[in-house]
């Protein structure tokens, strides 16, 4: 073949000798509306019948005209065809072009179909400014030069589009560099042009590298192997260009296989415009695989197939890659219509080679159809007069439609935006389209047709995509050293460090587990209370945070109703202890549990969490005592008792705010409880709502549902339970049940009566529970009848009734109860403690006024106050205190201590008003004080109805102290014979007296209201003598008996051995009276006589005392 540029120069010289025609506005030489179309076909070229041959493609133009008519395009116009044959020779094509324009006066030229003839035709038509549209095998890059050929159209894919498509594939699979190998055998221009196009694309984008370009001039096996060896050291992605259909690809890949360059590392990229990929079209419509020679199969076919599987192919599928499904019918119509006008090809079109339409026949159809569409646009635009003017025509030529060669898009330059295809052999060796590549100018759109990229690399290990640069480089000398070789020392160090780290981690984990286990054991010990740490209250703890019983009795306020553990005795369900905490003692209450559950890990975790629950309105759970005779749950002791106690005693004047505050505290406790891991209380009663020193309600006995046993609850304890729980016999409870119980407790507070007012009901608890289980409209509920002197918010009454509604679903949640309570007292922010203080201040003020009136004379007269002070303290002590001097404690080696107590005073006081009690005691003590003044005895204090005296201090009197106390004791008993209670004349006062001798320490205690106090075991012994004595008798210790006999004049008799609390077994005596050796002048008094006279009274009081003790 001759070069294009030499041929173009010859054509230019020929054309310049021709006269340049003058183009009129209307086509000349035509009759009517006729479009003259000139065709330049290839008839006898060797491969023409398969691709663009006249006998297998020409009728496509007629089919296109028929389509224009069906679509009402160019209506009223006819098409006249003039056909010339250039036989794919450029000089013939140039001459035919001139002949068609000058001789036949055609309006447009369709063709030629080869590169060199098309170049000649473009040059001529450009000179005459006549439209020309090429198709078929036209793909030379020179023909895409818009500046050179602005008036020509091309319906086939251009060679330049291959470079853009190759870049798109490289970018898709992340290959940044490649090698280009090209063959010039029989077709020098195509591959050289493709090289130039690739270099232009690489330079334009700059994101890929053309690492090496090699021309394979020697196509022998050795020559190919030599070229491949050069490629091996420069790349693994090998783009190859060669002439199609002569077996070069097979030969090239077999040489690569022989050179060891067929494997997972290598990818051979074949690219061609005039190709169908891995198959070669044959005459008659057949195809043969590229790995099989045209001469037939041989022994290398299997090797060739394996090599072809390491390649991919970029081509246009000869214009049939995306054709319509009716292309077969289209091809059959072409063959049939070739025998009709205007072709009348009968004899020449016979034979097996002309039974199948040419592969590019669809492009001829699309070229004629595109020309008709453009003319129709000119017609409608009123530019039909310029239809032969190529410059005017090309403005209307860009368009898009679905043609017989697929989707056709003609750009502004008059060339078609091609659709290329990426092909690969699948597992079944089929020529498979893997992707479409739509090229538009210098850009390409890659659309994969697979869902899994692995199908692209099915012949490779793990279906893995190859890389453009091997791990070891192209020459193999860049392989990274093995980790062990390069870092052997570091590996050893790392192993040692790793071993040490693992060992340390294992040790850490072990010690962490051990520490965690020990921490859990420590936390478990916090709630597991040893029984040995629970102490009964005795005198040893009184000095460590506990007052004596007598001190509490004398110091207890009726308003405060405060008690300590010392007053509490064991009940059916509770025990009271002092919990030893190191050197301190804490008062606690222990609830008995008959059921001992198995404490697994979950229950132990729950107990730890339960102990950590801390809220102002929850009583603190201290723990469980598991090693005692009975399982006990230990709780903090609240000194003011429970709400039930407050209601029962009725000593507190509760107003609206007082009731509201107690209810609010209960609600806050339940809100916290319902939101905690405990969930609900289950057995909420007024007995387990305790009140602490600050008048704050604390809910107790929660969270131990698993320890509850039905037999531990009396019928009366179930009166707070909701009806649904009673019916189900569920002692664990529910949140709704807690709300019901809350309503019952609120009713108790409002009415100031016990649960269901059982004191005034005829029914017993069992009957009430039966009615509650039965339910219905007459199911019993507490009557909310309250003292109307107290202002109760009506909304509170409604809320309480809602709480003990029969249906659980209709009861308000505890959150709802809290929000409604807030609305009832939104204006007040006082707390209950402040309220109680205000009440106490008011009470104190009234008392102060009363005392002020009664003690006016004492205030007015200083002497009387001194007298009173001397009566309260010894004169020597009082004088020192008045002078501001410190009174040092003093030890008295031998004194006699006297204790007395009015028998059955509590019963007697219950029959009197407070004022009568005061008058009674005043009258009695006045008599006693008069007796004391006659003896050398110092009155230490009165403790309620008790009397404490001592002789032998503050003035020592040798052994006379025991005589003075004995005479005073006999005088006390004697004086009771004539004492009468004014308002109870039938009642008699009787005393229980105890005395003991020993050493004591005396001193003044306190700065505010100082008191002269006695300390020593002798005092406790005297107290035990009194408490273990009998009414109307003088109980004497062995030491006092010894001293009595020492001074003489008194009669005693042995009582025998008696068990004394805190002392053990002691022998004690009765002082029966005075003997013959008494001091002269002393009145003879017999304790026996006094006792005999009061024997009946004593017997009655003893019976009453026994009844109260049993209670």
Curated annotation (Swiss-Prot):
The protein, known as: Receptor-type guanylate cyclase gcy-7
GO cellular component: cilium; plasma membrane
Entry keyword annotation includes Cell inner membrane: no
Family annotation (PANTHER family): GUANYLYL CYCLASE, RECEPTOR-TYPE GUANYLATE CYCLASE GCY-7
Catalytic activities: GTP = 3',5'-cyclic GMP + diphosphate
Membrane topology reported for the UniProt record: Single-pass type I membrane protein
UniProt source species: Caenorhabditis elegans
Pfam families: ANF_receptor, Guanylate_cyc, HNOBA, PK_Tyr_Ser-Thr
Record-annotated disulphide pairs: none
